[in-house]
Amino acid sequence: MRKRARIIYNPTSGKELFKRMLPEVLVKMEKAGFETSAYATQKAGDATIESKRALQEDYEMLIVAGGDGTLNEVVNGIAEHPKRPKIGVIPMGTVNDFGRALHLPTDILKAVDVIIEGHSVKVDIGKMNSRYFINLAAGGRITEVSYETSSKLKTFVGPFAYYIKGMEMLPQMTNVDVRIEYDGQVFQGEILLFLLGLTNSMAGFEKLVPDARLDDGYFTLIIVQKANLAELGHIMTLASRGEHIKHPKVIYEKAKSVNISSFEQMPLNVDGEYGGQLPANFLNLKQHIEVYTPKDVKNTELIQQD
């Protein structure tokens, strides 16, 4: 009996390239022995609903073609199910942080080849209150950039759109007084932003978490303490080289669980989408999701292989 695969794709991602190549992808999967069907999302939340339906239909594999937001929705659809299908990822978004972390090819047919080869690893995901994430959670005005940037601008200039929007928002940066509890430790004070990372790549910064491990059960907690615009600019420059962890205004820790609260409002970002406001409780779910990765790429700096 052939394995069944369900493709969940965002038809607007990647300048609609995947939609045009879908027939070729289906033929390739069928030739490889998979009974494959596809579903196109139309609005936010559709990928979550469809992935839950795919669980009820006992699909062995879900293939996600879209950006980090589409992948996040699929993860939220299957995370609470005891028998979760393996996930194949075809990176079609603007930045594709998760795809970068796993060294997935951006060429559609090469990404399909990775899935067909069948090499997979188990990776951690995070839970924030009642929702899940696979790449990062963050808080602070600057973290609004990813979901405040218009789709038209992203289509026109690609990842550079985030830098344009970020420069526009810099004058609006504010520090917020927070309490952060993590694995028995406590930080209390004013911060500009915090990041909780599961991978090494966030918003296109591939060295933001230079010692990332995708399956060790730990978040990387980055706290940028009260800072002015000049200090923030310096920290961001250092972050492009992975040297921000040495800056005196940066706290860099590993934690399995984190609780953050404040009497002030602080917007949250979950895998590039708006995640509400504080307070928030974060829990790392170790090796919770299984994903396909290139077998010829040594992820020694990222994945702890047995």
Swiss-Prot record:
Pfam families: DAGK_cat (PF00781), YegS_C (PF19279)
Reaction it catalyzes: a 1,2-diacyl-sn-glycerol + ATP = a 1,2-diacyl-sn-glycero-3-phosphate + ADP + H(+)
Record GO terms (molecular function): ATP binding; ATP-dependent diacylglycerol kinase activity; metal ion binding
Positions of Mg(2+) binding: 213, 216, 218
Biological-process GO terms, alphabetical: phospholipid biosynthetic process
Keywords: ATP-binding, Kinase, Lipid biosynthesis, Lipid metabolism, Magnesium, Metal-binding, Nucleotide-binding, Phospholipid biosynthesis, Phospholipid metabolism, Transferase
NCBIfam families found in the cross-reference section: PRK13055.1, PRK13337.1, YegS/Rv2252/BmrU family lipid kinase
Family the UniProt entry places it in: Belongs to the diacylglycerol/lipid kinase family.
Protein name, entry field: Diacylglycerol kinase
Species for this entry: Staphylococcus carnosus (strain TM300)
